[in-house]
Amino acid sequence: MYTNNRLVVIIMKSTIMVETSAHHLHVTAETFATLYGEGKTLTNKKDLSQPGQFACTEKVTVVGPRGEITMSILGPFRPEDQVEISMTETRKLGVTGVIRESGDLAGTPGCILRGPEGEVEIDHGVIVAQRHIHLTPETAVEYGVEDKQIVKVAVGDNGRKVIFDDVIVRVSPKYAPAVHLDTDEANAAGLMGTTDGEIIL
């Protein structure tokens, strides 16, 4: 706003939990049956912060043209296979790093998924997840933001504070409030586990 012919910028800040999301994948029931055998199901190892989401005991080796990475499956089953890795890990696998929202998989690289009982080749589904914020409709109103809005998030207080831009807001009654960064982003800010950050408007 303007006051006495001077431009005054008002920056709104809201504190929110920040989590590091390491590499993982989501699979369909059909893919899981091929990888682990008919009749097998996902084993809940640990509940995650997002309601209904859990890390599984079962792991899959993701194979690219240049290398491979073994990672955990996150449950429950999804309608489509999706592999989420960091930009650094795209180089290890030898695939193009494509930054996308979860579920936006058209035109993304594929890979081979290898389990103890078989393997599946997918022609798309490997993404570097766009950094994002999960909010309920109530917290979105409280923070003054809306679904698909792009905001900034400030994290780190150990001499490596970083302000991340291009953070997309995702609003759903199924969510719990949290910012998700990948391991490259968390390492850049020197984050150690779950911490607090500030949404900057």
How should each PLM-predicted stretch be described?
Residues M1-I11:
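Short, Lys/Arg-enriched N-terminal segments with co-localized hydrophobic residues
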Residues I11-M12, A140:
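Generic structural signal for short, solvent-exposed loop/turn connectors between secondary structure elements
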Residues M12-T20:
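Generic N-terminal amphipathic, Lys/Arg-enriched alpha-helix
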Residues M17, H24-G64, M71-P116, E121-K148, ...:
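Short beta-strand-centered segments at strand-helix junctions
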Residues D157-G159:
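Amphipathic terminal alpha-helices
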Residues K161-I163:
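Short coil-to-beta-strand transition motifs
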Residues I199-L201:
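Short beta-strand-to-coil "C-cap" segments at the C-terminal boundary of structured domains/repeats
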